[in-house]
């Protein structure tokens, strides 16, 4: 199974730049998208239901912000939105689909760069997400986690490492 993950930084913008041509030519089994920045009621039918894929969405409540999606050729057994924690779920950061043998996540982790309060939110999100994963693993589930973690392990992980040295997540 070929699984692609992409922070699109605005789904409508990448659609205008040929996203569906790319999707058709590459033909991945699954595409996990982060930072879609669109609510489903604002999307055209061809985006909501891409040809050859089952599409699942977890947009943020706030228009033009955050949000994740998964397009999959194989229909999942179940779909789960969020972590079950409203202060995280309202930002549309987690989408999980269950297949018979594993669960697949598309996650857009908070970046925590806009002050101490948001950094605390980011760390609490990490804790809640890891607790959620441990609970699923305790139930015997295999997990595949994709997404934008907003944490860089090494300088090569950033476009501008020198400019980001003092930012959270690096």
Feature map (PLM): residue ranges:
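Soluble or luminal CAZymes and related metallo-dependent hydrolases
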Residues: 14-15, 89, 121-128, 170
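Short catalytic/ligand-binding loop motif for oxyanion handling, primarily in non-cytosolic enzymes
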Residues: 40-42, 64-65, 113-116, 152-161
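Active-site-proximal beta-strand elements of phosphoester/diester hydrolases
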Residues: 1-9, 101-113, 146
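Short, acidic/polar
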Residues: 12-25
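Metal-dependent phosphoesterases centered on the DNase I-like endonuclease/exonuclease/phosphatase
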Residues: 51-54, 127-170
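Surface-exposed cleft-lining segments at the edges of enzyme active sites
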Residues: 84-85, 110-126, 162-167
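Structured beta-strand-rich core segments of catalytic domains in phosphoester-bond hydrolases
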Residues: 37-39, 44-112
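Active-site beta-strand/loop signature of hydrolases that rely on acidic residues for catalysis
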Residues: 7, 23-41, 104, 133-155
